[in-house]
From Swiss-Prot:
GO terms for cellular component: cytoplasm; endoplasmic reticulum membrane; intracellular membrane-bounded organelle; plasma membrane. It comes from Homo sapiens (Human). One of its GO terms (biological process) is xenobiotic catabolic process. This is Cytochrome P450 2C8. It comes from the Eukaryota. The modification Phosphoserine is found at S100.
């Protein structure tokens, strides 16, 4: 048989199989736009603004609908009621992690972000307990954040009130907090190892949110068969994990089980306690994966929110003035802010919440997956199906947040000026997969922002009317536009 004929027959078979497979799946899944063979709905989705495409689909198909990325169905939840019903009311069924081919190559299912089942539950529980309840050594995590806030202020003083792009400095601070938590000590901002770590994290963050990675996730054959920036990501990950392994070996050589210094020590002690359990998830590979995940989850996300926050405060000097007035009243100028201050600073608390709501860092949320065949609103979602909860549809709900596209701390204040909680506040997602670093991130945002505003006035280089605060959407994240700022010592 001629090779050309064989090729045509193979392609025809693949096409027919794709059509049959999609037809069988679609019968029980929520409705959605009709997918094309092999490529699914990719031509109907704007990869530069996925949320806009999904919002348009929700207007046609309702709050629960199905789209196809390639041949893989993704069930999307739009609006508070649908997101809450899935992630909170049916939390166990929707607690899986929807892993893309790229993330599988990177994590191999290890650590805390991309793991599932028993491994995820045990590693997550241990990490939460360690981060939340245990001040490692003689220093609490709050002490470490306060130390970094002080160092951040000193770095900002070095700008001498000249215009600067705050991206690098604001990236160093959260990364150094993670270094302090996992490696025991922080780094100088000019330390070469620290700068190398920062470079790799920044590079991977940029590449992973590029359209090329979305294409690779939809057509996994490209990952192994074609050159591209995804190979740079995999190389950076390998080098970072090698560095973490070196640090783990140093910790093993100096470990004192009665005096744990940091997260790595705590994990090594847990490994020793479970050394006779052959099925234990506490091993070196999961330790390396978990430490890497702490950096991934705790560096770029917090630094981007800080950067967006300063831009919004720059744009709204009346808000900045009220925060500084509250700082003067509650904290003063001669001691460092602490977390106990937050309950006495309702306006500042509201501002931090509004920064997170408005910045809407991960509009689509990190993908989930159903852990079992799940019936949801008369639809049957097969086990393993990827789920997307559109957090942006909750954070921008106009019934809960009047004028949701306007930055307004009043969204989190009652008529008496007291802080007002909202069930719609989901920047960290919700349910069983809510971000494990939520507590640390909240602490960093409050302490970093209050410490900066305690020590500096903010000045824009441009006319405030021309200062753009509209997010730049890249991949699954929203980033603030670039800007210059002057930190004027108080």
């Amino acid at each position: 048989m001629e090779p050309f004929v064989v090729l045509v027959l193979c392609l025809s078979f693949m096409l027919l199989f794709s059509l049959w497979r999609q037809s069988c799946r679609r019968r029980k899944l929520p409705p959605g736009p009709t997918p094309l063979p092999i490529i699914g709905n990719m031509l109907q989705i704007d990869v530069k603004d996925i949320c806009k495409s999904f919002t348009n689909f929700s207007k046609v198909y309702g709050p629960v609908f199905t789209v196809y990325f390639g041949m893989n169905p993704i069930v999307v939840f739009h609006g508070y009621e649908a997101v809450k019903e899935a992630l909170i009311d049916n939390g166990e069924e929707f607690s899986g992690r929807g892993n893309s081919p790229i993330s599988q190559r990177i994590t191999k299912g290890l650590g805390i972000i991309s793991s599932n089942g028993k491994r995820w539950k045990e590693i997550r529980r241990f990490s939460l307990t360690t981060l939340r309840n245990f001040g490692m050594g003689k220093r609490s995590i709050e002490d470490r954040v306060q130390e970094e806030a002080h160092c951040l202020v000193e770095e900002l003083r070095k700008t001498k009130a000249s215009p600067c792009d705050p991206t690098f400095i604001l990236g160093c601070a959260p990364c150094n907090v993670i270094c302090s938590v996992v490696f025991q000590k922080r780094f100088d901002y000019k330390d070469q190892n620290f700068l190398t770590l920062m470079k790799r994290f920044n590079e991977n963050f940029r590449i992973l949110n590029s359209p090329w990675i979305q294409v690779c996730n939809n057509f996994p054959l490209l990952i192994d068969c074609f050159p591209g920036t995804h190979n740079k990501v995999l190389k950076n990950v390998a080098l970072t994990r090698s560095y973490i392994r070196e640090k783990v070996k140093e910790h093993q050589a100096s470990l004192d089980v009665n005096n744990p210094r940091d997260f790595i020590d705590c994990f090594l002690i847990k490994m020793e306690q479970e050394k006779d359990n052959q099925k234990s998830e506490f091993n070196i590979e999961n330790l390396v994966g978990t430490v890497a995940d702490l950096f991934v989850a705790g560096t770029e996300t917090t630094s981007t929110t800080l950067r967006y926050g300063l831009l919004l405060l720059l744009k709204h000097p009346e808000v900045t003035a009220k925060v500084q007035e509250e700082i003067d009243h509650v904290i003063g100028r001669h001691r460092s802010p602490c977390m106990q201050d937050r309950s006495h600073m309702p306006y500042t608390d509201a501002v931090v919440h509004e920064i997170q709501r408005y910045s809407d860092l991960v509009p689509t949320g990190v993908p989930h997956a159903v852990t079992t065949d799940t019936k949801f609103r008369n639809y049957l979602i097969p086990k393993g199906t990827t789920i997307m909860a559109l957090l942006t549809s909750v954070l921008h709900d106009d019934k809960e947040f009047p004028n949701p596209n306007i930055f307004d701390p009043g969204h989190f204040l009652d008529k008496n000026g007291n802080f007002k909680k909202s069930d719609y506040f989901m920047p960290f997602s919700a349910g069983k997969r809510i971000c494990a670093g939520e507590g640390l991130a909240r602490m960093e945002l409050f302490l970093f922002l209050t410490t900066i505003l305690q020590n500096f006035n903010l000045k824009s280089v441009d006319d405030l009317k021309n200062l753009n605060t509209t997010a730049v959407t890249k991949g699954i994240v929203s980033l603030p536009p670039s800007y210059q700022i002057c930190f004027i010592p108080v």
